[in-house]
Amino acid sequence: MILTAMQDAIGRTPIFKFTRKDYPIPLKSAIYAKLEHLNPGGSVKDRLGQYLIKEAFRTRKITSTTTIIEPTAGNTGIALALVAIKHHLKTIFVVPKKFSTEKQQIMRALGALVINTPTSEGISGAIKKSKELAESIPDSYLPLQFENPDNPAAYYHTLAPEIVQELGTNLTSFVAGIGSGGTFAGMAKYLKERIPNIRLIGVEPEGSILNGGEPGPHEIEGIGVEFIPPFFANLDIDRFETISDEEGFSYTRKLAKKNGLLVGSSSGAAFAAALKEVQRLPEGSQVLTIFPDMADRYLSKGIYS
C-alpha cells in the first residue's frame, strides 16, 4: 500500500483469534479481538475523528479556517488532530490533568493546543471548559463526542461493517469497554440489526457508575463514565461487567507477554470481561471484543510495571 496521507490508513485493522491454547477458553469457542490500536493514530478513535470532520464539512458546520475544540481523555484529540492536518485546521483540546502525559504530548506533536482542567472535576469539567472556549473563540466548532450522534454513527458505518464482513453473523456476544459510549452503541446497533440474538456486554472499571456504583478514581484509562451516555437510550444491554484495575492491568501484561499485543489497559479489561463471558456460554460460542488503543501512551502510568 502506497499512501500520500496517513489519514488514508485509518480502518481495515486485523482481527486476532484467541483459543484455549493460551487462555481458559472452552472447547471450540473463541474470542475475536479487533485490533484498533493499529490505526495510524493508535486508537479506534481515528475512525471517529475522520467521521466527525467529514460530516462537519459536509453539513457546513466548519470551513478551512475553523478551530476545532473538544474535551477528551486523549485518543479523540489525537484522532481529530491527525485528521485536521489534512485540512489545515487548528485544534484545541481540553484534557483533565489525570490523563496520561504521553497522549497530551502526541496531541501537541500533531499541532494541537492542550489545555488542562483539574483532575477533581473529571471529564465534566473538561466539557464545561470546552463550551466556554467555543463561546469565546470566533469560527470555532465543538463536536462534543459525548453528545454528538455522529459518534455512534462513525462506528455503525465503518467499524461494524468491517467486522461482519470478516466474521459473518455467527457471533454469540459482543463485549466492549464503555467511555463516551459511541463505539459500543454504534457497534451494538449494527450487530443487533443483523444478529438479533447477540448478547451485548458493556465493560467498565471500578469507579464507573454503570453497575450502580458511585463514581470514583480508577487507573484504567479510556473507559468508565460519570454519567449515562445518551446513546444508550434504545439499547438493550444484557449486562455490565466491572473489572478492577488489578485485573485489567494483569491481562494487559499477559496480552503483551503471551501474544505480542502491545495494547492499553482498556484492552486488558475488555479481554478479561470477554473471558468471563465466553466461560459462561456453551462450547462453540464466538465472542467479539475491541482492543481500542496502544500501550505506548500509558508507559508513564506503569502499565507494564
UniProtKB/Swiss-Prot annotation:
Q: Which GO terms describe its biological process?
A: cysteine biosynthetic process from serine
Q: PROSITE patterns given for it?
A: CYS_SYNTHASE
* Cofactors: pyridoxal 5'-phosphate
Q: Which residues form a coiled coil?
A: none
Q: Which chemical reaction does it catalyze?
A: O-acetyl-L-serine + hydrogen sulfide = L-cysteine + acetate
Q: Which InterPro entries match?
A: Cys_Synth/Cystath_Beta-Synth, P-phosphate_BS, TrpB-like_PALP, TrpB-like_PALP_sf
Extract the CDD domains matched here.
Answer: CBS_like (cd01561)
Q: Which residues carry this modification: N6-(pyridoxal phosphate)lysine?
A: K45
What residues bind pyridoxal 5'-phosphate, as annotated? N75, G179, S180, G181, G182, T183, S266
Keywords, ordered alphabetically: Amino-acid biosynthesis, Cysteine biosynthesis, Pyridoxal phosphate, Transferase
Its subunit composition reads: Homodimer.
Q: What's the protein called, per UniProt?
A: Cysteine synthase
The major lineage groups are: Bacteria, Pseudomonadati, Campylobacterota, Epsilonproteobacteria, Campylobacterales
Q: Which gene encodes it?
A: cysM
